[in-house]
Amino acid sequence: MIHLHSPPTAPAAFGGAGSADWRRRRRWSWSSSSRAPVAKGGHLRPCVWRRGGDDGGGEDHHADGGGGGGGGAAWRARATTAGVSSSSSTAKGLQANIIEHETPRITKWPNESRDLDDHQQNNEADEEADDELQPLVEQVRSMLSSMEDGAITASAYDTAWVALVPRLDGEGGTQFPAAVRWIVGSQLADGSWGDEALFSAYDRVINTLACVVALTRWSLHHDQCKQGLQFLNLNLWRLAEEEPDTMPIGFEIAFPSLVEAARGLGIDFPYDHPALKGIYANRELKLKRIPKDMMHIVPTSILHSLEGMPGLDWQRLLKLQCSDGSFLFSPSATAYALMQTGDKKCFAYIDRIIKKFDGGVPNVYPVDLFEHIWVVDRLERLGISRYFQREIEQNMDYVNRHWTEDGICWARNSNVKEVDDTAMAFRLLRLHGYNVSPSVFKNFEKDGEFFCFVGQSTQAVTGMYNLNRASQISFPGEDILQRARNFSYEFLREREAQGTLHDKWIISKDLPGEVQYTLDFPWYASLPRVEARTYIGQYGGNDDVWIGKTLYRMPIVNNATYLELAKQDFNRCQALHQHELQGLQKWFIENGLEAFGMTPEDVLRAYFLAAACIFEPNRASERLAWARVSVLANTISRHFYSDMSSMKRMERFMWSSLYEENGNVLGLEGYAKDGILARTLCQLIDLLSQETPPVREGQKCIHNLIRCAWIEWMMQQINMKDGRYDKGRVMHPGSCTVHNKETCLLIAQIVEICAGRIEEAASMINNTEGSWFIQLASSICDSLHAKMLLSQDTKKNETTINQIDKEIELGMQELAQYLLPRVDDRRINNKTKQTFLSIVKSCYYAANCSPHMLDQHISEVIFEQVI
């Protein structure tokens, strides 16, 4: 049974008055009749829907669609349906400024719209689409299930240091012959060792010299040593030409140590080569900066580069050994320590990884936290995380188990922390609902500046980049995150202006583009499909290379399989979106909505915002409901704004379109355009109710609930001051509509209904549960709407806009604080919260995005196929 409350005005939470009186009002029973009551005096009242008996209770019988949109596949591709006209359908950056880009992107239909396969127009569409992608999905799933301490490529440099370890029993030869065998089998055709696919002079030279030293030390494979020396003689000059940002970790100390080892072995090497002078000078400077006493007492990143360093007190250093026996997870540093001390824990660490990697050890190991964190980041940014929710949850549980209030580094149980992995983990843990404190970043702040490692010599771009991303996920009062955001923003913008967005830890396809997107479109304004489309173009897959002591690759973090799955998935979604948009445009034209000042471009923008947030094929009903409600609500508002309509006329329109059985358009004689809108609204309500997943109460229940949502919205329009519309509040034609709070709430209600979350939609209409959350989200939308209007004014009031920006920022922080933590809050479904978050973020995006950039994103997301 459905009940209606009859408040005298709109509830206070949504801008109306008399909330207490509203709660005291009696209820009417609404059974089979669809005619709503009229309160005493003939004034129209918004309807409020509730289940159960007169006490508002009753058992929950709704069918939760789980965000799936139910039976949308059966209808989403058709343009018309029987009886209905057509198919259903910051610190900086965006916080205060409209993003402007010089080159506009003209958005238009492609010459030949891609046709969907026939199977995409029937109920089996989603299942068959999944079947086509399933091999790639299974490949990725297999990778994720194989994760242990990190998949990582071998380092010839580190393997050479392991090969240099003499037998611990005093007999002649190497302790680890498997390392020698790996070196012998890994020389490249040009005589060098190193990354075969990417030539870096730093990488090739240090790897090659290390391998020549190791083979010479044991008087093995003279021909290979000769080839290696020939390569070094021909390419040593390149060291002076290399970018300093791509210099491997500790190169200034490690390479001169190898040169001295070569000299001691009598190797024919150009020791006086001009390219070596600068390296030796930097070595002396760096050694002078290293606090020798402190490095023996407090764990620092220096422990990672001990090999060849003079004047070490090993008895003191052994106290700083990691629990796995390594020195900060470095095989080369640990091998050097083993040579100097014969320590059993050092031996156990080296022996374990030699066996695991069949002789060729990596430059760092383990890298378990690094891999677990970065995998989740890549899957989410590529837009394919929905296929791997269980695996992602397992990854985040793993990271959370090893999280500490001091931070983390690339491996568990580290006694040295760094900001890059800490920031990435903080961001993902918070987004996934884990309770993490931002005070962790106090460990990386000194004198108003943030750093990655204690004692670092240069600042890493990616460290500050991930710190900025983490700082965007802030709650009210978290000043440390505000400071981190300001500092990282200024650092990154300065490097951007200088054209020096190169990093010392990664050689990626488009790091400058990644940084620019994050600064221009922070978390509040980053829409899922826009982010995915952008990152697909930035992700290098197999070609992304990391910089440690040598170049290395992380095959479960960077690989072609993720990229191929992301491309195919994006293109399949895009093809469906194009088909839906065609139906939506047809619906718009057939209903004559162009006569009200709306344009096909307005429809395109409305659909884009919906599809950019709700993009999954099996959520078509939610996506099209969002777009259609947005278009029609905006059309109705514009129509009555432009005519400066009276309250009586608005009431008459609402009565004819929403209260009369099947709509009484004849009641609007003399107002032809009003009749067109009334008819369109009635038909849309019918269509939405038909295409919503069935519930126990039946289709009539859904139909009435959708009408209640529209009545609530119409009442808000009628109850405006003096019953008149302010023509100045209408946004300029062609601009991206940023809805006010009433329209945002209407969209949220109907999206929830179309998703099958009937109880949640009813709660919103009743506004009796979770009202604070709904009011907050709606208030943010209203502020964004006001900002959009002010930004279009020729006489911009910057003071007012800045004040609104501050209110929006605080509101978004409060919204994030409510949305993100994992709490047992049964008042509002988590998926309903996500609906509100999507709507608010779409408004944030639209209020701050320039028309040029908006059109570019529309082109990329809706029209331009990923190649």
Swiss-Prot record:
Origin: domain of life: Eukaryota
Binding site for substrate: K286, K504
Biased composition range(s): Acidic residues: 124-133
Gene Ontology MF annotations: ent-copalyl diphosphate synthase activity; magnesium ion binding; terpene synthase activity
This protein's pathway: Plant hormone biosynthesis; gibberellin biosynthesis
Function: Catalyzes the conversion of geranylgeranyl diphosphate to the gibberellin precursor ent-copalyl diphosphate.
Other observations noted: 2 different ent-CDP synthases exist in rice, one being involved in gibberellin biosynthesis and the other in phytoalexins biosynthesis.
Name under which the protein is recorded: Ent-copalyl diphosphate synthase 1, chloroplastic
Species the sequence originates in: Oryza sativa subsp. japonica (Rice)
